[in-house]
Amino acid sequence: MIKERTFLAIKPDGVQRGYIAEIIGRFEKKGFKLVGLKQLIPSKQLAQDHYGVHRERPFFKDLVNFISSGPVVAMIWEGEGVILSARKIIGATKPLEAEPGTIRGDLAIDIGRNIIHGSDGEETAKFEINLWFDQHEICDWETSDSEWRVES
């Protein structure tokens, strides 16, 4: 049985500032399972496809340029309620509105440099996972403590 999955990406500012381990640790501690992980410098085309919903917005070009300016850590996380939980762990898009204890509330200041991207729903997650990962890059595995994470 496939559990809920979401796509997360540590943006170039998060990578440059050395937050990869801290961010991954927050999701591991919550009990989610990492099933896809890679670091890459996204092409402009990948960035445009990823943020296509914002194509007509005035910030689109700057967003594409930023995301493709340096390394991004792309991840697929799996677990019960992972999409909503990830959104809560990440915090509000505008870091100054993000609650303390969230990634953006603790680590980010500016909306244009808000450290991390997370899928906002099930359909978006499926689209983003398929955009960033080939099927052979996804590891379907079971944790040895899965029975202790959620009630059956």
Swiss-Prot record:
It comes from the Bacteria. Its cofactor is Mg(2+). The keyword Nucleotide-binding applies. The active site is at 117 (pros-phosphohistidine intermediate). The keyword Magnesium applies. Pfam families: NDK. One of its GO terms (molecular function) is nucleoside diphosphate kinase activity. GO terms for biological process: CTP biosynthetic process; GTP biosynthetic process; UTP biosynthetic process. ATP binds at residues 11, 59, 87, 93, 104, 114. Homotetramer. Belongs to the NDK family. This is Nucleoside diphosphate kinase.
